[in-house]
Amino acid sequence: MAKLSNGYKKFLLLWVASLISTSGSGMSSFALGIFMYQKTGMGTMTGLIILAGFLPGLLLSPFAGALADRHDRRLLMMLGDGLSIIGLACILFSLQFLDSKLLIGGILLGAAISSAFSSLVEPSFRATISDLLEKDEYTKASGMVQLIPASRYLLFPVLAGLVLSIASIHSVLLLDILTILITLPITYIVRKEMQGTHKKTKENLKEDLKLGFRIIYDNKGLWLLVMLGVLVSFCLGTIQTLMIPMLLSFGGESFVGFATTISAFGMLAGGLTLSKVSIKKDFTNVLQYALLGMGIAMIAFGWWQNKILVCIFGFCLFLSLPFANTVMDYLVRITIPTIHQGKAWGLIGLISQVGYVVAYATVGGFVDFIISPFLQESGNFSQVILALIGKGEGRSAALMIIIAGIFLVIVALILPRKNEIRELEEKSEESILD
C-alpha cells in the first residue's frame, strides 16, 4: 500500500470532520422535509424548506469564496460550522414556543440563518484541498469528497425516521448540533498544523469577485462545465423536492427513508470506486456516460410504482453522479490557479447551483398547479400518460422527474459535439505528464 502524504493525511482529517457535520445536517433536512409535508400536505412546502436552507448560503458563497482567498481557510470552516448552530436553535425555539401561524415562518428563518453561516465552509474546504494535495491526488480526493453529500442520504435518513418514530423532531435537531460540536476540534487540529496560505491583497472584495468571474467566463470550457453543473443541480433538486411526495404515495415514512438510503449507497459506491481508481484520461467520455446514466435512471425511477425497482434505479442514479462531479471538479481545479480558487469556487457554487434554486422554487408548484390538474383531465393525452406511468397520488411528481430525466439524456447525447471540454481535457493530460 502506498504511503499517504502528510497533506493527504490532513485532508482525511478535514474530510472526516465534514462527513460528520454533513451527516447531522442530513438528518435535520430529512426530518424537516417530512415534518413540513405532513403539516401542509403540499410538495410546494417541501421545496420551500429546502430552498430556505439553501438559497442564503448560495447567494453568500461568492463572498465566502473571496474571504477564503484572504483569510485562514480552516478558521472560516470552524466559524461557518459553529455559527450555524444559531439557526438550529431558532428552529428549536419555533417548534417549542410558536403557534401554528408563526411556526412555519420560524422554521424557515432558522433554516436560512444556518444556511447563511454554513456558506463559509464549502469554498474554504474546496480551496484547502488544493492547498494540501498534489495534482495527481486530486481525482482520488474528489472521489472521497463525493462521499460527503452521500452521507446525508445513507443511514442517517433511516436513523432520523427511527428517531421520529420514538421521539420528536427536537431530538433530531439536537443530534445535528452534537455533530457540529464534534467537528470543531478536528478542524482546529488541522489548522494548528498548517501555515496560512492566504496572501494579503490590495484589491477590494468587488475586484476579487470580478476577477473570479472573468477567470470562469473567459475560459469557454470552464463556462460550459458550470452550465452543465446548473443542469445537474436542477435534476438533483427535482429529485430532492419530489421524492418524498412520490414515495409516500405507495410507501410510508420508513420506506422513504429506506429508499433514500439505498439510493445514496449508489453515491457511496461511486465515490469509493473513484477513491481507489483515478481518472486520468477520456474525461469527456466519462462525463457523457455519467450524465446519460443519470438521465436514464431518473426516467426509470419515476416510471415504476414498485418499491424494489425504485430502489434499484435510485441506486443507479446516484452511482453515476460521482463520476460526473469528479470530472467537472478535476477539470476546474487543474485549470484555475490555486491562489484564485477560493473566489472561483464561490462563484462556481453560486452559478452552478442556480439549478437547485429553480428546482426548489418551481417544481413543487409546477406539479401541484399544472401537472396534477392536467393529469386529472379526461383528455386522450393525459390518459395515455397515466396508462404508461400508472395512476394514483404521487404520479404527478413522478412525471416531473421523468421529464427532467429525458432532458438530461438529450444533453448527454449532445455533449460530445462540444470541443471546449476536450480542450480542457488535453491540458489536464499534459499537466499529469508534466
Where are these regions (language model features)?
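MFS-fold secondary transporters
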Residues: 37, 90-98, 114, 186-187, ...
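Small-residue hotspots at the loop-to-helix junctions and early N-terminal turns
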Residues: 28-31, 35, 40-47, 143, ...
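Substrate-agnostic recognition of the 12-TM MFS/MFS-like secondary transporter fold
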Residues: 12-29, 50-68, 72-85, 106-165, ...
